[in-house]
Structure formats: C-alpha cells, structure tokens
Amino acid sequence: MRGLIINMGEKYNPYEDMLKSMEEAADLLGLEKDDYEVLKYPERELKVSIPVEMDDGSIRVFEGYRIQHSSSRGPCKGGIRYHEDVDMNEVKALSAWMTFKCAVVNIPYGGAKGGVKVNPRELSHGELKRLTRRYTAMILPLIGPEKDIPAPDINTNPEIMGWIMDTYSMFKGYTVPGVVTGKPVEIGGSLGRKDATGRGVMLMTKEILQRQGIPVSEASIAIQGMGNVGGAAARELYLEGCRIVAVSDVTGGIYQESGLDVEKLSAFLQTGKMIEDYREDGVRHITNREVLISDVDVLIPAAMENQITEEVAGSIKARIIVEAANGPTTSEADKILNSENIIVVPDILANAGGVVVSYFEWVAPRTVVSTCPPRIM
C-alpha cells in the first residue's frame, strides 16, 4: 500500500503476533495453559475461490475467506474486508480479536472475520456487486442471524451489506435482515452504525485525556487513516474542540501546527479525492511515518495492522495511543511503548463502538431497543 508503513524484514504474520500477545496477557493474569488453549485455534476456517464475470466478459477468480474463531459466547460476529493484502493469517487474527473485543464490552457474541483478496477500486460497481453476491453464496453455509453475522470493514459499506442480505434472503426464500449489520437504514440498519466505531474512538480518547488531566480543548491529535473509522473519529474530535494537527491516507499525510480544518478536509475527501491532492495555506505534506511520530498528545492509528513496529515505536512522541485500527501495534513494539510509559488504549476496547451498535441493530427486531443515535451514544 502506498504511504503506509510496511515492515520490509521477515514477513509479518498477524496471527502469530496475536498468539504471542495473548500468551503474554495470560501469563500476566496467572492463567494456566489449559485455561486459554482453545482460544489459540479457530473453530472453523473456510477458504473459497470466487469466479466473477468481468464487464469485458472475461472471468477472474478471487480468493475469499470466512473464519469463525469462537461461538462460546453466542453467534460469531465480525466484518468483511475487501483488500489486496487479505490472507488467511490476517483473517484468523482479526477473528480472534473480535472474540476478545465482544467479551471486553460484554455483548453475547463470539468472534469471526471475512475477507476477499481484491482491490475494489479496480472493479466497476457491477463487478463489485457480482463479486459480493458470489462470495455470499459460497460462505452461505457458515453465516446466519443465529450463527455468524457479518458487518462492514475496510472497503465495504452499507450497500455491500445490503447485497449480502439480499443474496442470503434469496437462498432462504424470505427476508432475513439479521444476517448482517451495518446495512442501509431503509432495510433495517441502525442510524448510528456508520460512524459508531469512530464515535467510540472519540469517547475513549476523551476519557483517557480526562484521566490524564489533559483538557480536551487543548489536546493535539494525529490520525493515521481517514477512512470510515479515522474520518469519523477526526470529525467527532474536531467538534469536541481537539486540535487535529496531522492526518493521512494511503497516499500520504498532511500537517498543520495550528490545527487542520477537518470539516473542509472531510468535504474534500468525500468527493473521492485523496490527501495527496489537498492544498490549503499553512498545510504541508508529510509521510505516514511522520504522522505516526508527530509531536502530539494523542496518536490514533486508524489504518491497517502492523503500522507501529519496533522500528517506529522508539520514535513515537505521543503520550497516548488510541488504537482505532485492529492490531496496529506489534507485540514487540508494544514492549517498547510500555518501557517509554506511553499509554495505549488497546484496539479491543478503543474501536468496540462499531460492534456495540451492531449488536443493537441485530437485537432491535427481537426487542423494543431503540437504535437512534442519542440512545446509542
């Protein structure tokens, strides 16, 4: 990926890193090996080959996955991402993190994750729809409102969730809104779901700032990633009075000491343009690494996993890190941050807002729970 930090040494294996972190945490808690042995292994792993007819009539075959890590607390829950770097080990790690995340916020879900190895920007709207429908058909035996409930993730959105719901419902012969969350409001989605993860990041950031005695209105913040999560977090924190001094996407970053105009930047990005194209007085362009090592109160990695590595950790100047992305910090980097007394709000808490609101969306038809944003947040 252009602009993001990539470890050029031995290939990073997120699943092995997750296992290492879990074992270290278990040791700190004084757990016996038998207490967590089952959590080292996913319950089910499905790899599928997805043939798709392209607009020119040719056939391309894409690689897809659905991993169910644990159903011990309830139906499996986890997003589906479309990204060219998706592989089995990444999806396995993400599914395990979902298990831990749902347990941390005490909602009755286990963990799952799905993904397709594709760059969705290279596909037309029709090709993306055909890919989604075929992928859904191939993971159909695993998913269902009482078994495994997908949701949006990187490069997937409410429209794609709507296609999944429609395809699943066609096979069942009746409408099944509960098979996915994060779907359009018009077909049973939650009004608060789209920005829920970013809003949760904002709430976690405010909480940790208050605990550290830093006035929210005086806090300086750098955000790596301006997608669904990072963009929403930036907007919410900006409205709270924080000074957003640096942000980035896959094309690079920008910096303004006095604080970026996040409303103007968000409007610019919503036109489909990238940060490398953004030009304003007082704004200078920097690299993603420079965003990560900005001299700020709070760093929010909101892009991919494996961004804060050993090489980066020693140069970080932020006093607080709020992990909006899943697995952005490697286990070795985490040790360095701890030795430097840098506070880390872990991903399984910091970005749990999305799955919490997904739970409300899923449970609403079964109860009288309201899913309007004021009630959710």
PLM regions and their residue ranges:
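Adenosine-phosphate binding glycine-rich loop
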Residues: 8-13, 208, 318-377
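Short, Gly/Pro- and small/polar-rich lid/capping loops
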Residues: 9-49
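Conserved active-site and cofactor/substrate-binding residues in soluble primary-metabolism enzymes
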Residues: 13, 17-20, 86-89, 123-134, ...
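Glycine-rich, N-terminal phosphate-binding loop and its surrounding beta-alpha-beta segment
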Residues: 48-56, 61-120
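Glycine/serine-rich phosphate-binding loop and adjoining beta1-alpha1 elements at the start
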Residues: 83, 103-217
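Glycine-rich phosphate/diphosphate-binding loop of Rossmann-like nucleotide-binding domains
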Residues: 189-293
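Rossmann-like adenosine-cofactor binding region
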Residues: 252-344
